[in-house]
């Protein structure tokens, strides 16, 4: 992710002045932005980067209406029709509290999640939608074993407090402490993954800014 961003930065370094409005998914922003935003501010102070966190549907609408210049989100059917610059692939991992039976497993199968108290994002988040589909979680929702709140970070705090199971993206692992990493369990094969891309419209002309990101 960060290496790809750096590679794009080296391609063009002109026409970087002015305001650039970037939409980012809430499940991507906390883990990707800290990797390049400080360097961008230091090396290109003339670039006024405005970042807003939005869900996929909101981002696509804002791009169509010209409210955003570009967006960082996950490649989905909804993103087809836009100019897509691949940034990176990443896996999902399971975050398990010490009080759950799954904590003793070295890897997690999707069938292991049935009946578990899962912390999931609200509907409309592609992060949730991908995992619900991959892990066959509707049955868990119907059994009222799945609860919803607002952010991955909130769910992580709940798990660390001894409550339930949640999912986090691979890029988040770099920010975890040794103690937090003890709660991480990989999925058994097949492993759910996502592709993070930079999205722009076909008439986007500030290519230097796009390449910078």
Question: For each predicted feature, which ranges?
Answer:
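Flexible hinge/capping segments at coil-to-helix
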Residues: 13, 79-118, 202, 210
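Short beta-strand->loop
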Residues: 83-93, 166, 170-173, 178-193
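Secondary-structure junction motif
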Residues: 117-138, 206-208
């Amino acid at each position: 992710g960060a290496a790809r961003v750096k590679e794009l930065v080296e391609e063009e370094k002109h026409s970087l002045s002015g305001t650039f409005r970037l939409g980012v998914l809430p499940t991507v922003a906390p883990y990707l932005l800290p990797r390049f935003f400080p360097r961008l501010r230091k090396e290109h102070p003339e670039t006024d980067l405005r970042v807003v966190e939005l869900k996929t549907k909101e981002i696509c609408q804002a791009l169509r209406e010209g409210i955003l210049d570009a967006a960082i989100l996950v490649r989905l059917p909804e993103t087809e029709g836009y100019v897509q610059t691949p940034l990176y692939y990443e896996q999902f991992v399971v975050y398990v509290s010490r009080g759950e039976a799954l904590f003793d497993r070295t890897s997690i199968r999707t069938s292991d999640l049935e009946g578990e108290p899962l912390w999931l994002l609200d509907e409309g988040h592609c992060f949730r939608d991908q995992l619900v589909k991959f892990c066959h979680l509707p049955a868990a929702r119907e059994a009222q074993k799945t609860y919803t709140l607002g952010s991955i970070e909130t769910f992580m705090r709940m798990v660390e407090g001894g409550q339930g199971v949640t999912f986090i993206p691979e890029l988040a692992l770099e920010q975890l402490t040794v103690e937090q990493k003890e709660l991480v369990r990989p999925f058994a094969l097949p492993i759910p993954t996502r592709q993070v891309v930079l999205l722009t419209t076909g008439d986007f002309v500030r290519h230097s800014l796009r390449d910078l990101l």
